């Protein structure tokens, strides 16, 4: 994939996430330096199209990471002691 294709995909995913923020403001928050997606909403907002690369617990946080339409998506949540 060349540079222009990557930029195009990045613009597409940005538009997709902005649309999700408008439709589901309680689940998606975009600020200057980050995009936050509610943990339970991650799979619902990005079904089947997310190719999970990693799912792990580190320093009290559970992380999910994967690719969606050429963009790398990350979400995490604090793990309660009874879940660890």
Tell me what each language-model feature is.
Residues 27-72:
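Acidic, low-complexity, intrinsically disordered interaction modules
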Residues 22, 73, 77-79:
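Cysteine-centric segments in proteins
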Residues 1-2, 78-84:
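Short intrinsically disordered terminal tails
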Residues 1-34:
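Contiguous, amphipathic alpha-helical segments that mediate oligomerization or scaffolding
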